[in-house]
């Protein structure tokens, strides 16, 4: 874990490599079969900016119905290979990359998802496959043989990477997410608060794991995801400081 100054420096360093101004023309997404890529913008903002944005968004966007109390807790266990490829490619600003994680919500085992997030420039594509609590425990114990012949292609590919590239757990990332949506979810704005790294374990169901904050005090990550184009009414309310645009990676921040 680094200091607040180190975290901020890392965010700005990565942001300079892959960031772009909102007004610039967006690159076309990769075309691979029927995969649906979404554009993703990230900002490092203050809680004061968030309060102002909430007021401006309220007449335009709706709270995501999945957030019963306005927000929910996300806990993700990130994996990386023997060479820490996902980490290194992110820091180096490699435009096309991927990472694996297992994600739960509000510390519950009701929904457990194995996810793979692929990124090409500023476009993202996410795949997921369901897991049971027992299957998660087996993965954590290194028993991944059951995934070799899974009905889910993502599980089979995870198995291959686990065996051939020594894919292993690296860090647990926690944060509180407040989600907003527009046009039935084609535009999604989220505020990720209290981003922290768990230490001393990889069991995502262990609520007693100690955690450490990774952002400087008073800061949070705002994400804007959309397909094809971003409506002008949303563009008009986005943070205006170009230097705040960043490719903040929670995995990189927490792994450090």
Stretches found by the model and what they are:
Residues 1-256:
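Phosphate-end processing signature that detects enzymes handling 5′-triphosphorylated RNA
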